[in-house]
């Protein structure tokens, strides 16, 4: 990232992308913010619109080092929203910040259906309007915001997975940071049970078992002698290489479908030797591929 934000007199410069998400109540603004949060954006929902420039200023580059950028969610609940929104945009532009404005909407009938399903009140119903009139009035009031939007998302026929794919394709790599898919590698022992959260499970009980070598039994798949034993045959090394090739082929396909988290469980009998060695081999490769990857040896001390 660039140097930290400075005062206006110094010529403030934002070193990170700034996005503003607004739109019709019930159209999916909160869902959009959740997707951006999963993509490692710093998200703030319900921010008073007049505070947007100050928020951008105080969140300097160092504070946002682990994030892709800022996403601010704003809606009509605030009095004089449209007027203050226009003033906030003008202030941001004076600061040299050109935020990307996303407007989220849906067709009237779909919004009516969603409110009937959730049974939540529309913000404008507190002004004495019925739901249908409140939706129409909100659309009218927010017309200037929609007109100023860089992108308008109509979520009428969008599932959450559709929405995630659209946002992911466009904004997941603005800063060239880690890929959006988070991979959790879990080694485990079948004698203790398969991890319930696993999306993919691989059974490695066909590999050479160090347990039957009394000198290796106290060690684990974290130790070099065990790794050399497990992958000491041509067939074991071929499996390891093909397994890793398979995973590096498969993970981008999950990523392209909008998945943001996947748990890969790798098991052997006790969860101490073969599964640990293979999980560590996969970890080494995935870390070089810029995935956000974690590893857990669940039964290492039990096996």
From Swiss-Prot:
Top-level taxon of the source organism: Bacteria
Binding residues for ATP: 23-30
One Gene Ontology molecular-function label: GTP binding
Signal peptide (UniProt feature, chain positions): none
Record has ATP-binding as a keyword: yes
InterPro entries associated with the record: P-loop_NTPase, RapZ-like, RapZ-like_N, RapZ_C
Keywords annotated in UniProt: ATP-binding, GTP-binding, Nucleotide-binding
Binding positions for GTP per the UniProt entry: 75-78
Stated family: Belongs to the RapZ-like family.
General function of this protein: Displays ATPase and GTPase activities.
Name of the protein in its database record: Nucleotide-binding protein DVU_1631
Source species of the chain: Nitratidesulfovibrio vulgaris (strain ATCC 29579 / DSM 644 / CCUG 34227 / NCIMB 8303 / VKM B-1760 / Hildenborough) (Desulfovibrio vulgaris)
């Amino acid at each position: 990232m660039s140097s930290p934000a400075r005062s206006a007199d110094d010529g403030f410069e934002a070193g990170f992308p700034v996005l503003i998400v607004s739109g019709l109540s019930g159209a999916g603004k909160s869902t959009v913010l959740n997707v951006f949060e999963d993509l490692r954006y710093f998200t703030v929902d319900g921010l008073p619109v007049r505070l947007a420039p100050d928020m951008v200023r105080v969140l300097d580059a160092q504070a946002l080092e682990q994030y892709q950028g800022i996403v601010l969610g704003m809606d009509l609940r605030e009095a004089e929203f449209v007027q203050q929104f226009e003033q906030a945009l003008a202030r941001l532009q004076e600061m040299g910040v050109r935020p990307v404005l996303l407007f989220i909407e849906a067709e009237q009938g779909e919004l009516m259906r969603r409110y009937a399903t959730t049974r939540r009140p529309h913000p404008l119903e507190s002004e004495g309007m019925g739901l249908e009139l409140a939706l129409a009035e909100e659309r009218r009031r927010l017309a200037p915001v929609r007109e100023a939007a860089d992108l308008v998302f109509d979520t009428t026929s969008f599932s959450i997975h559709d929405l995630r794919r659209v946002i992911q394709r466009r904004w997941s790599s603005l800063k060239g940071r880690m890929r959006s898919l988070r991979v959790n590698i879990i080694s485990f022992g079948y004698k203790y049970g398969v991890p319930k959260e696993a999306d993919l499970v691989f059974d490695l009980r066909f590999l050479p078992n160090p347990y039957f070598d009394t000198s290796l039994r106290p060690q684990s798949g974290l130790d070099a002698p065990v790794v050399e034993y497990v992958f000491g045959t041509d067939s074991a090394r071929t499996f390891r290489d093909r397994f890793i090739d398979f995973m590096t082929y498969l993970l981008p396909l999950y990523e392209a479908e909008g998945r943001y988290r996947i748990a890969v469980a790798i098991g052997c009998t006790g969860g101490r030797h073969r599964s640990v060695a293979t999980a560590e081999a996969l970890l080494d490769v995935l870390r070089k591929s810029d995935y956000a990857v974690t590893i857990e040896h669940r039964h290492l001390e039990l096996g």
